[in-house]
């Protein structure tokens, strides 16, 4: 009985407080509503709201957020505007015309220079690396008719789009005309060593000028032809301009017929190699390409980059029939012609790596000091993983291995590795015919070491630079002789 009496008393107290609270809130709200004529929020009657008695809460939360002076609470809906979508048919955006970058200015100046002394002739678009003047699919020409009012000229790396300048029906005769090429200076380079070589007269024993192509040659004596290119470096905008002119006296297998389709593939041996390709031409004694490729490359990278050309047949089947290469460290800001000797494609991987070595004969201490300084033109990895390189050195006396040492393993950066290590090899009076065998290896984290190339340092070496370095070292004791050496694949 006592328990039920206490419950009824407590319930009456709470119920009474709740009714008083509801009555006071309803009275305040009715007094506030007439003061706001255009209230945008409608509140349902308090009788429909179930107010649960809670300890410590004196009023409803939503009602406490209403303005105390009865101001209108607006509800604003944001206005949405349609965004502008650039039409796809607009091929020359107006904002590009306002861009006067160094690359665009250089391209415009170059175009004016080429067009200043042009002659009427076939209109070759040399700035388009994939331009094909005579090889256009009939199906594409029907579906996409040519539009003469818009021309897009571009290089392979830099986007150099600009309107075609008026008055340029052909190319500059001073740059691309080969009819007077005999009167101009052409520097001929060996494709392997990139050393200028003399052009000997092609005469037989009777002194006639009969071409040696009529004589059947075999093996290494055969002439595979020459590739004529034009190069120069624009240092102001850090661009290299490569113009493939023509391929002369090219030989191909007889199974390919009399007129196979030939193209030139170029490679810049950067850490991430850059590839470009000319249009396909019909094979002949002198294949004209006349195509220019523009690439952005920093000046310091020219010391470590080689330019490799591969001559490929497209029909009757795709195959590399010749290759040639040259170093870019001697590239000039003046435009120069190069004639590269084409060699047969190697069946093994071509090694373009070079190693800088220093030698010193210390006669007082009876020892030879060998310095492994630096390597360049290193091959890049086909995977995202960076290759590391090291050098192994072996000292031989009379054909027997006496000492062997190696450098530490270092990662390549921009195709270069700098060791700067010095190795000491003691000498004994009985030791004769000293020979050093130096090998370069690469290693990745997913496979074993891989042989890159090697060089013999001795007076009997097959490398002229190695022979000269060894002779100078022996003749001049205590003198450090430093030379760059191109590594051989075997």
Swiss-Prot record:
Origin: domain of life: Eukaryota
One Pfam family it belongs to: C2
Occurrences of domain C2 (ranges): 223-342, 344-471
UniProt xrefs under InterPro entries: C2_dom (IPR000008), C2_domain_sf (IPR035892), C2A_Tac2-N (IPR037786), C2B_Tac2-N (IPR037788), Tac2-N (IPR030542)
Biased amino acid composition, Low complexity: 192-211
Primary location class: nucleus
Alphabetically ordered keywords of this record: Nucleus, Phosphoprotein, Repeat
Motif Nuclear localization signal, residue range(s) on this chain: 447-449
Residues the record lists as Phosphoserine modifications: 83, 156, 168, 174, 211, 218
Modified residues (Phosphothreonine): 214, 216
Cellular component terms (Gene Ontology): nucleus
SMART domains per the UniProt record, alphabetical: C2
Compartment(s) where it occurs, according to its Swiss-Prot or TrEMBL record: Nucleus
Ranges for region Disordered: 189-215
Name by which UniProt lists this protein: Tandem C2 domains nuclear protein
